[in-house]
A protein has these predicted regions:
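C-terminal-biased regions
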Residues: 2-42, 49, 53-146
Length: 146
């Protein structure tokens, strides 16, 4: 069994479980946002404005929760960077080589998963924005003809 509380550098003392828990929470919140964005897209395509307004509120709330977790992670990573003698603006990926070898694959995997999910979320947000824009154009065209 791997002891995650071990440290890899004399000046760095923190719980690997805390960082892992924070990353798992962030991953879960991003997953929740992805689900909301899919629902938002369905409401756009099905022309359900009342449902869309409600989902938009949920999306904003979820994005705030994600932002809060991301800020916590950035603070944690800044502290780690300082402890390892690295620049404060180092990314978690840049700090992974400082971690104990036994923990590196686990953290690499979850960081990759989070980054992939963020990319998917950005694509979905862009799709939804374009759909809403196109829906507005079509509505304007219909009203101009009427």
């Amino acid at each position: 069994m791997v002891n995650l509380t071990q440290t890899s550098s004399p000046g760095v003392d923190f719980s690997w479980e805390d960082l892992l828990s924070l990353l798992r929470d962030e991953l879960g919140e991003y997953g929740g946002l992805m689900g909301l964005l899919s629902s938002q897209q369905a409401s756009i395509l099905n022309r359900e404005p009342e449902n869309l307004l409600e989902i938009n509120k949920s999306v904003r709330s979820q994005m705030e929760a994600n932002n809060n977790l991301q800020q916590r992670r950035h603070g944690y990573v800044r502290s780690l960077a300082t402890g390892y003698g690295k620049p404060e603006d180092s990314s978690l990926s840049e700090l992974l080589p400082c971690f104990p070898v036994v923990t590196q694959p686990m953290f690499e995997s979850i960081v990759e998963e989070i980054n992939n999910l963020i990319s998917r979320i950005r694509r979905k947000l862009d799709q939804n924005r374009r759909l809403i824009s196109r829906l507005g154009e079509v509505t304007d065209q219909i009203l101009a003809v009427a």
